[in-house]
Regions:
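Short catalytic-site patches enriched in acidic/histidine residues
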Residues: 31-48, 70, 111-116, 171, ...
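Catalytic-pocket segment enriched in acidic/His residues
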Residues: 2, 19, 25, 94-209
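N-terminal accessory regions of nucleic-acid-interacting proteins
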Residues: 71-85
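Hydrophobic beta-sheet segments that form the core/acyl-binding groove
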Residues: 45-52, 66-70, 132, 186-193
């Protein structure tokens, strides 16, 4: 099972410099969006693709797990609120007519947030290598040092919008390469973050077994 049972799953978009230089200005604040807690699945559970979407991709993300209530926090307060870290897969479906890919129809489908089953504590996350591999082919290869906002700053940003409670998760974004990480039924996606661990899930069509 996932290492926590969040009531809120918040996530940052455009928080990696190698991605932002292609789509936005590097001085823009990262975007914050939500994923439904109902879309969490454990390692090795299938990612189920909807029949209506022809383009679905995976995104490796370092996930922060909250250990104490936090709201409108400073960076120092946010840092103290972090219980630990795990790995997450921010699965995304291309939206209708190519519209905003951070809406519920893209981000919150059933099974669209695999989360690791191990919570890591007491580690330095400043420069961790993170990769995505699909059927043995590497599609993402980045490092947490390239984030615009680090752990504490990410939690502080989200806390200015909404309260975070123990067990909640903040996904801190994904590096470049997501558009090369398209998945289809029969594929296997394996994500890995140095010092955190691996997260592997098979891909099936929704409605199949």
């Amino acid at each position: 099972a996932p290492c926590c049972q969040p009531r809120t799953v918040a996530a940052l978009a455009y928080n990696y410099k190698d991605l932002v230089v292609r789509v936005a200005r590097t001085d823009d604040e990262p975007l914050v969006f939500l994923k439904s807690p109902a879309c969490l699945v454990a390692p090795h559970e299938p990612i189920r693709l909807p029949a209506w979407s022809e383009r679905v991709w995976v995104e490796v993300a370092l996930a922060l797990v909250i250990g104490r209530p936090v709201f409108e926090a400073s960076s120092d307060e946010a840092a103290r609120a972090i219980l630990g870290w795990t790995i997450a897969n921010d699965v995304t479906a291309a939206n209708i007519c190519g519209r905003d890919h951070h809406l519920a129809r893209s981000k919150s489908l059933v099974s669209f947030c695999p989360v690791g089953d191990i919570l890591r504590r007491g580690i330095d996350t400043a420069a961790l290598r993170m990769t995505t591999t699909i059927n043995g082919s590497r599609t993402q290869d980045g490092c947490t040092r390239d984030r615009i906002l680090g752990d504490a700053e990410a939690v502080a940003l989200v806390s200015r919008i909404m309260p975070l409670l123990p067990g909640d998760i903040v996904l801190t974004g994904t590096p470049a390469g997501a558009m090369s990480s398209l998945i289809t039924p029969g594929d296997r996606a394996e994500l890995e973050i140095e010092s955190i661990g691996r997260l592997a899930n098979p891909i099936i069509r929704r409605g199949s077994r």
